[in-house]
Amino acid sequence: MKIPNLYFHVYLAALLMLTAVPAKAADVKELFAIDLADYPGKEGRMIEVSYPPGAQDVVHRHDAHAFVYVLEGQIIMQLKGQPAVTLKAGQTFYEGPTDVHVVGRNASNTEPARVVVVLLKGKGAPIFKPVKE
């Protein structure tokens, strides 16, 4: 009777995969936007990114200079080709216009995290673009 037992375990594994809860997404709120007259074609944006416990970003890029400041909690950040870093409240992080952000997630599964990001980007360009790996 080992065969029915095997079927049960295969069925259970398939059921678990189908009902797995997807990773929580971060919430992005725009705080401020301004045209930069001294930099033709550029604008400044300030956003707040709130990460619920366990939340993570999709792989993306900004096509902008992004200056990140951690307000609350701990965030794990990694740019393509660089090691991951864990940042806590009061620490900063920089992403350049050609960087691909491969990891951006809340380091905690129980506590929220928040960052504020200042972007210097092309006027009218999206704040971020998902990247396929």
What is the role of each PLM region?
Residues 56-58, 76, 93, 97-106:
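Histidine-centered metal-chelating micro-motifs
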Residues 27-59, 118:
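A short glycine-rich, His/Asp/Glu-containing loop-to-beta-strand
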Residues 84, 99-125:
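Ligand-binding loop in jelly-roll beta-barrel domains
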Residues 36-41, 51-52, 81-98:
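Short acidic-glycine-tyrosine-enriched beta hairpin
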Residues 21-25:
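Sec/Tat signal peptide C-region and signal peptidase I cleavage site
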Residues 65-77:
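Short, conserved beta-strand element in jelly-roll/cupin
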